[in-house]
Structures are given as C-alpha cells and as structure tokens.
Amino acid sequence: MLAIAGGKGGVGKTTTALGLAAALPDRPLVVDADCDMPNLHALAGVPADERPHVCPAHDCRVLPTPEDRPDSLDQCLERLRVEADAHTLVDTPAGAGVDAATPLRIADGVVLVSTACAPALRDAAKTASMARAVGTPVLGAVLTRTLARPPNVAELLGCPLLGVVPDAAGRPLDDRRVRERYEAAAAALLDATTSL
C-alpha cells in the first residue's frame, strides 16, 4: 500500500494517484482517504458510493470515501492492506493532522507530491518527516505542473525524484505528455518498491 501524500492542498495528489495507477500493472486500487475534500470519484468519473468501481479511462479501480469515515478509515485501510490483490494507492488529505497521518502510518511506503514552488516543497518535506516519524519509508517524489528539477530537491525531501509532470490545459490525464511522465514515474516507483 502506497500513500500518495503532500502537505499542501491543490498540488496534484489526486491526479498523481490516478496517473500512477494508470501506469502500474494489474489494475491497481486507488482509495480516497480525503474525508474533508473527497474528489477522487469526480476526477475518475465514477459514482461516489462506498464500493470500488472500475475506471476504464485509467485502467484502475477506485474506492470513493465511505460516508462513515473517518472513524473507520484506519480499519478500512488496514483491511485493504492485508486483502489487496494488486497495488493499492491511497490519495491522502493535505496537512499534518490525524487524517493525514493515518494513511501514512498504515502504508508500506509514501510517494510525495508537490509543485516546484518553495512553500509546497517545504510542506512536502514536513509530510516526509511525518511519514518517517510513524516508521513509513518515503520512496520518492513527483513534482507536478513543471518540467524543472529544482536544485537539491532530493536532498530537501530526503528521497529520490521519481519524475516531473508538466502543466496541462484542461484535464491533465488527457494529455499524452502528462501520461508519459506518469508512466516514467511509475517505472521508477516499481524499481523503488522491489525492496518492500
């Protein structure tokens, strides 16, 4: 189970979760763990009920946020972690509260998502620290809405940069360049997860 996380809202965590899922084998499951602002179902184009839906556009399965969360969030994630038959990616909420820490604690690894701007990178570094504090390794980072690789970003975040994803007009995952970048990031992620 991989938590797709970043401290700042609006940096592309949900898009990255779907983009990576589309590029991974075995029709991964993407879980929306953002109880306050659940939008995975809308981006994936599936109903917002409490069961997994196949998302043909991204060749994955999507589990929207169940209405009875957050109390059952950790139970749901623990169950999925044990029972999953394919990669499971958890779209986490922004911030440093309990809602953000729960998926980090349960996951086997974390993928950070950030834009290249300094405040977002600082927040991503805080998320990395939070993951490490609960004993979860940070496997890498994806920078969104940029083709630039800021100097020392791997050192700041304490993990390798899996990829950079360009900005796109309209729906990012409809853009071929964006999909290709997520495919490259997913390949790097698979290399990083062979040790898990």
How would you describe each model-predicted region?
Residues 134-196:
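C-terminal lobe/tail of nucleotide-utilizing enzymes
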